[in-house]
From Swiss-Prot:
Belongs to the prokaryotic AdoMetDC family. Type 1 subfamily. Binds 1 pyruvoyl group covalently per subunit. This is S-adenosylmethionine decarboxylase proenzyme. Is synthesized initially as an inactive proenzyme. Formation of the active enzyme involves a self-maturation process in which the active site pyruvoyl group is generated from an internal serine residue via an autocatalytic post-translational modification. Two non-identical subunits are generated from the proenzyme in this reaction, and the pyruvate is formed at the N-terminus of the alpha chain, which is derived from the carboxyl end of the proenzyme. Keywords: Autocatalytic cleavage, Decarboxylase, Lyase, Polyamine biosynthesis, Pyruvate, S-adenosyl-L-methionine, Schiff base, Spermidine biosynthesis, Zymogen. One of its GO terms (biological process) is spermidine biosynthetic process.
């Protein structure tokens, strides 16, 4: 039996309205809205405005991170949402971003991170193996 420690969604959003992803203030509000909507826990954040267009930003979460990098001149945004614990929060954060940006096309990759064995008896396998060596 195995369990997954985290879920990572990488999304390429195409056909996004220029104005929604050009200014750092809007990009920051987008990610902070996703964090709130998904009930995630923000630790810190950093955002940057590019000249002449585009923005980038990351929010460090207790659960991991959420980030964006934009090319408004191409109507493109690269989104990264990775959380540990409940998968539903990862999907909820991405849902908020997609509903807000309304892209014409989405290319999404989903990866389960940290697939580890589960020992239902609660026995520490590592200690047992060390004792046998």
């Amino acid at each position: 039996m195995e369990k997954t420690l985290g879920l990572h969604i990488l999304a390429d959003l195409y056909g996004v309205d220029f104005e929604k992803i050009d200014h750092v203030e809007d990009v920051k509000a987008l990610l902070e809205g996703a964090v709130k909507y998904a009930n995630l826990s923000k630790l810190s954040s950093h955002f940057h405005q590019f000249n002449p267009h585009g923005a980038t930003g990351v929010i460090l979460l207790e659960e991991s991170h959420i980030s964006i990098h934009t090319w408004p001149e191409h109507g493109y945004a690269a989104i990264d949402v990775y959380t540990c614990g409940g998968k539903e929060k990862t999907f909820k954060a991405m849902e908020y971003i997609i509903k807000t940006l309304k892209p014409k096309r989405i290319d999404e990759k989903i990866a389960e991170r940290g697939v580890v064995p589960v020992n239902p008896e609660g026995v520490n396998i590592e200690k047992m193996q060390l004792a046998q060596v």
